[in-house]
Amino acid sequence: GLTSKLDYLQQLGVNALWISSPLEQIHGWVGGGTKGDFPHYAYHGYYTQDWTTLDANMGTGDDLRQLVDEAHKRGIRILFDIVMNHTGYATLADMQAYQFGALYLQGDELKKTLGDHWTDWKPGAGQTWHSFNDYINFSDKAAWEKWWGKKWIRTDIGDYDNPGFDDLTMSLAFLPDLKTESTAPSGLPNFYQHKPDTHAKAIPGYTPRDYLTHWLSQWVRDYGIDGFRVDTAKHVELAAWQQLKDQASQALAAWKGAHPDKKLDNAPFWMTGESWGHGVMQSDYYR
């Protein structure tokens, strides 16, 4: 994997590695492209489903620790790509595994159409990879509340609040928009009760923003991650990014204090954000 390439990267003069988000993504696929002519997987790391666990495709905690430690030995910092604006789409794989959402199919028709493992479905004659949506009852309010829950996201499904039309409340690419602006305690996402591998613990009074910044900064505290590249920065409140920066900075300082033999230097935590469509004019996103 990547760790085995560190010597080569060092020889090239690389001093920082910005890696795709290694956090757990949605499982399975959704229809890809406007025509649905291929299955689209969350290979890019932008459909995070659980901010407390690593995606199995990226390796284990030991693998990550080895990467960070070996990179630091070579003068290379590790940066995570991270997302707090949205989560991923609902997939057949996750609906079945975590018991949320509803289908129009029942009994023998369900088994005949989707089989024992729903994610094995493939489009038939006259169908595309988008056609799996035809089997899903998106209007069943109770069934879809078992997914994230209204306190966590806004989306055009079930009884969720509809997305807005501004940068902060819109549904980017029809993705569920996380309510990072909310001041209401949320509890954990509802489907996490069926997700035994999550490390998420309920914290009294925490909002979605509080959970997200806590979970992300924990990777810094546990592994010594040096920085974040923030995706979709303009779609999340600046106060949320400041909260994350503050917590991650404290976390890295704590990690360096606990691991003086592993730290690269005393440099503080570093963050940069993508504000799509922004020119070189001065603003809160560009100085």
Would you name each region that the model predicts?
Residues 1-77, 85-87, 92-95, 107, ...:
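N-terminal structural segment of carbohydrate-active enzymes
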Residues 1-8, 201-222:
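Short, acidic/polar
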Residues 161-164:
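Intrinsically disordered, low-complexity regulatory segments
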Residues 176-205, 233-250:
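Active-site cleft segment of glycoside hydrolase catalytic domains centered on the general acid/base Glu
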Residues 10-17, 72-79, 223-228, 265-271:
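Loop/turn elements at helix/coil->beta-strand transitions in domains of secreted/extracellular proteins
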Residues 68, 86, 101-102, 106-129, ...:
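Active-site-proximal helices and loops of the catalytic beta/alpha 8
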